[in-house]
Regions:
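Glycine-rich phosphate/adenosyl-contacting loop at the front of the ribokinase-like
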Residues: 1-64, 69-80, 254
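Conserved phosphate-binding/catalytic loop of the ribokinase/pfkB sugar-kinase fold
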Residues: 90, 100-138, 143
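Conserved phosphate-binding/catalytic region of the ribokinase-like
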Residues: 2-11, 33, 173, 204-303
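Structural alpha-helical scaffold elements that stabilize or flank donor/cofactor-binding regions
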Residues: 131-132, 179-180, 219
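Conserved beta-alpha-beta core of the PfkB/ribokinase-like small-molecule kinase fold
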Residues: 138-209, 233-235
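Gly/Ala-rich phosphate-binding loop of Rossmann-like dinucleotide-binding domains
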Residues: 53, 158, 273
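A glycine-rich helix N-cap at a beta->alpha junction
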Residues: 77-92
Length: 303
């Protein structure tokens, strides 16, 4: 019914190596903790690209990977998933690192990250931006990337009249990108991030209360649609055409919550790009997130 395979989606974002610690019991910050450690390929952009590929599309990923170490393996893994990696630069120490301790119920207990320097991507966009964007159907980008990158992406998007779908990993940085958030076709964030963006208390709000806040605050912004994820309470959405609603979450056992937000964003974006109604797009994103949550993997893979 929906034509996923013919759409060209350009994804611009980060690549990380995730180091995940799973304690055998309750994590004791000042004590010795036994458990297991797993290394997973991560980064919001990388995850989103691979999630979209899991739906049968062949997204174009614009990013940086390492010229040594895990770089070749990360790129190979993306290619095998169907991601086009022609515009990934290889640079020494090019990827970021995220260390995380998980709780027994699959939530993040503590984390630390070394951000990736993506400035060379701005030079790539100067050189090959027209080639990348000219026939694109849509762009998915981490709004909190370097200003030099974000400004070029939106300039190219306007030049070729391509819709931009935005997600974030750091709202503190994204608050300095409001002009770009306003230019998004759809912007997705979680409850805490929405509270920061709206300068409003969103903690412990019910889905109905959160939807009312979203519909009211959307009037202060220019993006066409916005979706706020609410963890176990699902998500709420509102659009300028007054379409709004709630999408409940699936009741499942959580193994590892990391990557779920990325897969939700990937599903929503792909659905909207393929002309799904927003309620169906949110349902697709929710189903993809449910698959990711039930494993220690960071990305969605269809059965």
């Amino acid at each position: 019914m929906y034509d996923f395979e013919s759409k060209k989606i350009v994804v611009i974002g980060t690549v990380f190596m995730d180091i995940k610690g799973y304690p055998e019991g309750t994590f004791i910050p000042n004590g010795r903790n036994a458990g297991r450690i797993e290394y997973k390929y991560g980064g919001v952009g990388r995850n989103v690209a691979q999630d979209i590929a899991g739906l049968g599309l062949k997204p174009v990923f614009v990013s940086i990977t390492d010229s040594m170490g895990h770089g070749a393996a990360i790129e190979s893994d993306l290619k095998e998933s169907g991601v086009i990696t022609d515009y990934m630069l290889r640079i020494p120490n090019g990827i970021g690192t995220w260390m995380v301790i998980m709780t027994p119920d699959g939530d993040v207990c503590a984390n630390l990250s070394k951000r990736q320097n993506l400035i060379p991507v701005s030079l790539l966009l100067d050189e090959k931006g027209d080639e990348i964007f000219a026939d694109a159907d849509a762009i998915a980008i981490e709004i909190d990337l370097e200003e030099e990158i974000v400004s070029r992406v939106f300039r190219l998007a306007e030049k070729y009249q391509v819709d931009v779908y935005g997600v974030i990993s750091n709202m503190t940085i994204a608050l300095n990108r409001i002009e770009y958030i306003n230019k998004c076709k759809c912007f997705v964030c979680n409850r805490i991030e929405a509270g920061q963006l709206f300068d409003t208390d969103t903690e412990d709000k019910s889905p109905n209360e959160m939807l009312d806040i979203l519909k009211d605050k959307l009037n202060d912004f220019r993006m066409e649609c916005m979706i706020v994820t609410l963890d176990k309470d699902g998500s709420v959405y509102a659009c300028k055409d007054e379409t709004s609603g709630m999408c409940p979450s699936d009741q499942i056992d959580i193994v590892d919550s990391t990557g779920a937000g990325d897969s939700f964003f990937a599903g929503v974006s792909a659905g909207l790009i393929c002309h799904m109604p927003i309620d169906e797009a949110c349902r697709l994103g929710t189903e993809m997130a449910a698959v990711v949550i039930q494993s220690t993997e960071n990305t969605y893979k269809a059965d």
